[in-house]
């Protein structure tokens, strides 16, 4: 493109941008929230107990106790997480709260009653550290930041974290006490960890320093967007084989299955870890909301029933993701500037996000331009520790909550802003 042509094209884009600004749009692609239609799929939860509060063991769900969760929910969670019921705790509505408690318990009290608290292991001048595959989940990183735990980014590829890098870091530094993971349809890049990567994760306990924990946040275990979804190897089973089960903490929930703000959460680990967690949990609560657990079990029943529900979720979500990809393909595919593509993007087989990469140094500018045109995006850098994307390229797109019309409008603006930001660099 000649200089004159480039200037004319830039002016055309500016004119279009100003026309969009005049519309005063108010569109939001920031968070991976279920849409109202998805929440409505589980409206039968309301009133499902019909006055019958008896759990499978005969206990009354309305009363105190049952810190581990009701038996039928523990059995269900075991199937969901690939665990044994004896290895499972069922909690309240927030899996993030479970993860926060796991980390804070270890930090202040130790991973078990005889272990040194993480904060006391560092000694003078040292610091406790966590490995953070990046880009990753911003709320994981917030837990570390709140506790003053140093975060070390780990490179990701299409198979998961760079395990050579993970293993090398662990061998070199016993003060690395954990690693964050979203192993299936990772937030935000949609990666599913390969069998080899999961197998190497299961052996990390043999490499790491004492009291190391893998926080395996399997938030999207059944959240597929394709007909034949990829499978994730079972970390718990592999960890048992390698004798490292104490190092694995697997987390899940129904937050994007039933009601996002009123679901139930799951945690699986060694029986010793679960027992230690319950001991500390008992200081803060006499038991979870077992009525909510019971109504979930009456509604979800078993994994085949859950998968039928997830198909209904997919029917709602899939057209939204297809529309996002349609705009990216038609608006940006094949276009280059200075010999480089205007952007690259993921095609997730599940989960809640599409990850877009701009040319280096442009993500924050694209987000700012979109905001100026009435489209809110997750702030650039949010998916990295300390909110610092070293290349300033990652933008997370979350199309689950808005309707198709809103996504259509928002993606037109997004494509325009990517092209405009690239030409103006």
How would you name each of these model-derived features?
Residues 217:
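Glycine-centered flexible beta-alpha turn that most often forms the glycine-rich phosphate-binding loop
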Residues 366-372, 410-415:
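Short amphipathic alpha-helices in soluble, non-transmembrane regions
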Residues 355-361, 377-412, 416-417:
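Conserved PLP-binding active-site segment of the aspartate aminotransferase-like
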Residues 311-325, 338-357:
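Conserved glycine-rich beta-strand-loop-beta hairpin in the small C-terminal domain of fold type I
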Residues 54, 59-210, 221-243, 415-425:
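Conserved core of the PLP fold type I
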Residues 2-68, 72-79, 372-375, 388:
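N-terminal "arm"/small-domain region of PLP-dependent enzymes with the aminotransferase-like
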Residues 91, 239-318:
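Conserved core segment of the aminotransferase class I/II
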